[in-house]
A protein has these predicted regions:
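Extracytoplasmic
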Residues: 32-35, 63-65, 92, 103-107, ...
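A short, solvent-exposed beta-edge/loop patch
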Residues: 111-143
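Bacterial Sec-dependent N-terminal signal peptides
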Residues: 1-25
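Surface-exposed flexible segments
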Residues: 77-92, 135-138
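Generic structural motif
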Residues: 4, 43, 73-76, 115, ...
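Early exported N-terminus immediately downstream of N-terminal targeting peptides
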Residues: 22-81, 85
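Short Gly/Thr-rich strand-loop-strand
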Residues: 87-114
Length: 144
């Protein structure tokens, strides 16, 4: 329950999916053992209340959402591969740890990277002893 609340909180404060890099990551693991995936397109976000999508976080105002990729996994071998890949991706793309919450085996983190003048990338990462959840979110700070 804590993990779900954390993920929903992260979605509310960020509401954004990290374009090409995250699509590749999503595609790599979408058919892996024990993995469940969800993709939310920019068109779906356009159906949402635009005022609700005008999110402000850390002096950054998110004006549009480009999509969101969600990866959930409960297979131990696949989790190990995902964790290795996500650690590499976060270290290579200048992500800053924004929030971290630990409770026993449960650990949740939100990372943010500003890309160029107007794009924001967020990664919401949550794991416990049985599964791992990753949400990639991208958005623009300027109107499209």
């Amino acid at each position: 329950m804590k993990k779900l609340v954390f993920l929903m909180f992260a979605f509310i404060i960020a509401n954004s999916g990290q374009a090409q890099v995250d699509k590749e990551f999503y595609n790599k693991y979408s058919d892996a053992k024990g993995v469940q995936t969800t993709y939310i397109s920019p068109s779906m976000f356009k159906q949402m209340d635009q005022e609700a999508l005008n999110i402000q976080c850390d002096n950054i105002s998110l004006k549009s959402v480009h999509g969101m990729y969600v990866i959930d996994c409960d297979d131990p071998a696949t989790i190990k591969r995902i964790k290795k890949d996500i650690d590499l991706k976060l270290s290579q793309n200048e992500f800053e740890l924004m929030i971290e919450s630990k409770d026993g085996d449960d650990c949740s983190r939100i990372y943010m990277a500003k890309k160029g003048n107007d794009t924001i990338g967020l990664v919401v990462f949550s794991e416990d002893s049985e599964d791992i959840n990753i949400v990639f979110i991208d958005g623009s700070t300027n109107e499209d």
